[in-house]
Design a protein with these regions (language model features):
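Conserved ASCE/P-loop NTPase catalytic core
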Residues: 103-104, 120-128, 133-135, 144-149, ...
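Short, surface-exposed polybasic-aromatic patches that bind anionic ligands, especially phosphate groups
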Residues: 483
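C-terminal engagement/docking regions of AAA+ P-loop ATPases
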Residues: 477, 486-496, 509-576
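Long, intrinsically disordered, Lys/Arg- and Ser/Thr/Pro-rich regulatory tracts
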Residues: 1-41, 310, 322, 343, ...
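AAA+ P-loop ATPase catalytic core
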Residues: 288-295, 477-480, 496-511, 528
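OB-fold/S1-family single-stranded nucleic acid-binding modules
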Residues: 143-145, 221-258
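Conserved phosphate/pyrophosphate-binding and hydrolysis machinery centered on Walker-type P-loop NTPases
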Residues: 116-118, 264, 280-285, 448, ...
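Long, low-complexity, serine/threonine- and charged-residue-rich intrinsically disordered N-terminal tails
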Residues: 1-202, 206-216, 226-231, 278
Length: 576
């Protein structure tokens, strides 16, 4: 009785009792002596703010978390009492089982709920929604009668039992009055949970269905019953951008200061930590940098809805590219690899939401249906299924060996840009590295692991920065695009312009700036020119990636001078 009084005080304080009274009055207005004999249900949805409940009545909040079914039973008793208190003769014909309070939880602290599935208490699960079925009927009210017409022996149940109940008086098996059945809607929602191999499906009913969006992370609050799991509430998990005052890892802070905030130098050094033991330090830097930019863009897309940078590499041999992709994918929140036996690429892309979808094999190894499906999804930005539509929320990483130029250009137009794979530029360095690894194999040490951990932390810190382009940077990108388009119309397309802008903005984001300047624009252009198949716009000397920073600075300075001549625009005079 004490629990009833506490819940009653809470409902009164939050003005829920008034809402219950109004719901009861509306119910009685809609029934008469004839319809009341059909045992219609009265349902009331109670939205409980758990944080507020814990603040007002801590013991009551703890009771809700530990004993949710008893809490709901108390609410049912209170709603039935509200109905009985009304001055209406029809209330005498209403049974307690006709009354049901549907509890929906808001702001349930994840740290207070149980994470392991067990009876009684509320269990909170956090997972990625990867699929929804078509709506079907959800039976929430059934009436069972005695075939011998025993008086007053109707049984009201909120589900369809596997075995029909029996009459309390004559012990006959009851039959259901199918005309009195009440139904709502339900769907089967499939969630992918971290550290659990197989996805799990849950039944989502009525008002909760509208909250479901495929590809989003959700916190699901469930109550484990004997034969089923009841979902009480579902809330979308949103990532909050890190505050500006959040401390940066000390090593990255020192590196940024040593690089004077120059994007080409700072990002070059950051990207060099990817795949340290896969290839020599200065090999495939164009690939490493683009992988890093893609990782940042995925996280930024979740926080600021900025464009995602996809990754495509081409070359005579892309074996090292596949290894670098595998190492870089470990920095993402999640990643999914597509094999040649995947029948549905859309499922893999949805499963990779918030992370990256890696195609570890060359494009030639995949079926034409798989390639066409992925290209169509990247181009439209939508994943279409028979029962739902979802936005593409992951980056796609792919590579192809010995692709014809026209094929590479067409696919690169959809991906946005092309990275330079192995064209024999680093044959000597790779041979020496392979020999050294064979003689003295090395493993990833503590310093390498810490460096990658710092980069992952740094990506989380900068991803929430909203970036805009300065007028001069925007003009620089436009002039380069027009000049390059005039030089090679097939190699430079509209899709490349979007990738240039995204790379420029991501460069500024990595440097913790909310305005992209000319340095960011030149860096994005340098990446674009470096990744093109030969013959490239700029001389090879201007696109080298030496391990020495002084040599790299000379390369970038030469590229600045070449770019000014290529577009007829003075960069330094207007550099902000």
């Amino acid at each position: 009785m004490e629990r009833h009084l506490q819940i009653l005080l809470y409902l009164e304080k939050r003005h829920f009792l008034v809402d219950m009274k109004n719901a009861c009055q509306e119910f009685l207005q809609d029934v008469n002596e004839k319809t009341i004999r059909k045992f219609p249900p009265i349902r009331f949805i109670l939205q409980v703010d758990v944080m507020e409940l814990l603040d007002l009545f801590p013991d009551l909040g703890e009771f809700l978390i530990q004993e949710p079914l008893k809490w709901q039973s108390c609410c049912n008793d209170i709603l039935f009492a509200c109905l009985k208190c009304l001055d209406n003769d029809l209330t005498q014909m209403i049974k307690p089982t006709q009354v049901a309070v549907v509890i929906r939880l808001n702001s349930l602290p994840y740290i207070l709920s149980t994470k392991q599935e067990k009876y009684k208490s509320i269990v909170s699960l956090c997972g990625l929604l990867v699929g929804i079925t078509k709506p079907t009927n959800n039976v929430y009210h059934t009436v069972w009668s005695c075939p011998d017409e025993c008086e007053g022996n109707e049984v009201i149940m909120h589900f369809i039992p596997k075995i029909p109940p029996k009459c309390y008086l004559c012990k006959s098996t009851l039959f259901e009055n199918s005309g009195l059945r009440r139904c709502g809607d339900q769907v089967q929602a499939t969630f992918k949970f971290k550290n659990i191999l197989l996805p799990q499906s849950y039944t989502i009913v009525d008002d909760l269905i509208s909250q479901l969006k495929v590809g989003k992370m959700y916190t699901i609050n469930v109550v484990i019953l004997k034969k089923l799991t009841s979902v009480w509430s579902i809330e979308e998990s949103t990532i909050i951008p890190a505050p500006i005052t959040t401390p940066v890892p000390s090593d990255i802070k020192e590196l940024y200061e040593a690089c004077n905030g120059l994007p080409w130098k700072f990002i070059y050094c950051l990207a060099s930590s990817i795949g340290v033991h896969v290839c020599p330090l200065n090999c495939f830097m164009n690939v490493k940098i683009n992988l890093l930019l893609s990782l940042v863009s995925v996280k930024a897309n979740a926080l600021t809805s900025s464009p995602i940078i996809h990754f495509l590499a081409g070359g005579f041999d892309t074996g090292y590219i596949a290894k670098l992709m595998g190492r870089a994918a470990l920095l993402a929140d999640s990643f999914v690899s597509i094999g040649t036996t995947h029948n549905s690429t859309s499922t893999a892309l949805i499963g990779a939401s918030g992370g990256v979808c890696v195609m570890p094999l060359p494009l030639q190894a995949y079926s034409q249906n798989q390639i066409n499906s992925i290209l169509s999804i990247i181009e439209t930005g939508e994943i279409t299924h028979s029962t739902y539509k979802s936005k593409l929320q992951c980056a796609v990483w792919a590579h192809g060996m010995d692709l014809k130029k026209i094929v590479l250009y067409n696919i690169g137009n959809i991906f946005g840009s092309v990275c330079r794979g192995d064209y024999g530029d680093f044959a000597d360095e790779l041979a020496d590295h392979a020999l050294e690894q064979a003689i003295t194999p090395t493993t990833v040490g503590k310093q390498e692991k810490q460096a990658l951990k710092d980069i992952s932390t740094y990506i989380d810190l900068v991803a929430g920065i909203k970036v805009s382009l300065a007028e001069n940077a925007e003009e620089l990108l436009r002039l380069y695009f027009l000049a390059a388009r005039k030089e090679k119309p097939k190699a430079v397309t509209i899709g490349n312009l979007g990738a240039l802008i995204a790379a420029c903005a991501t460069s500024a984001r990595l440097c913790r700036r909310n305005v992209a300047n000319n340095d960011d624009a030149v860096f994005a252009i340098w990446l674009h020119v470096s990744g093109m198949p030969e013959p490239r716009f700029a001389p090879d000397d201007y696109l080298e990636t030496p391990a020495d920073m002084k040599k790299l600075q000379k390369v970038i300075e030469k590229f600045y001078n070449w770019l000014e001549q290529f577009i007829g625009y003075r960069i330094y005079e207007t550099n902000e």
